[in-house]
C-alpha cells in the first residue's frame, strides 16, 4: 500500500448491478452513519445511474466514485476492519459489485 508517484489523490470506483434495493439501502444507511468515508478523507464525487450511456455501458449498472487524498487513504478505508466486517457484509445478496482504486492523473 503505497501512494501514487505524484502523491496526489486516488479514486475508489464501485460499479454495481442491484437486485435487492432493501439490502442496498441498509448498506448505504450503515455506511453513511459510520462516518468511514470522512474518517479516511473520502468524498463522494458521484453516484447512481449514468446520465447518458454513450458507449458499452450495460443497462442497470450504476456506479459510485469516491475521492481520497491518496491511494493509501483509499486502501485504509477499503481494508478497514469496520468496513470489511461491519458494513460490507450488509450488501451481500444485494447485487453484483466490482471495485477498484485508481490513481489520479
Protein language model annotation of sequence segments:
Residues 34-35, 82-88:
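A common structural junction motif
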Residues 73-74, 83:
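A generic structural signal for short hydrophobic patches within well-formed alpha-helices
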Amino acid at each position: 500500500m503505497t501512494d501514487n508517484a505524484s502523491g496526489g489523490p486516488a479514486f475508489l470506483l464501485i460499479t454495481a448491478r442491484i437486485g435487492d434495493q432493501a439490502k442496498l439501502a441498509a448498506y448505504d444507511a450503515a455506511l453513511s452513519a459510520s462516518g468511514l468515508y470522512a474518517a479516511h478523507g473520502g468524498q463522494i464525487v458521484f453516484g447512481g445511474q449514468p446520465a447518458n450511456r454513450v458507449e458499452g455501458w450495460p443497462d442497470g449498472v450504476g456506479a459510485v466514485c469516491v475521492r481520497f487524498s491518496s491511494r493509501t487513504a483509499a486502501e485504509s478505508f477499503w481494508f478497514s476492519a469496520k468496513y470489511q466486517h461491519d458494513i460490507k457484509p450488509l450488501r451481500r445478496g444485494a447485487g453484483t459489485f466490482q471495485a477498484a482504486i485508481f490513481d489520479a492523473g
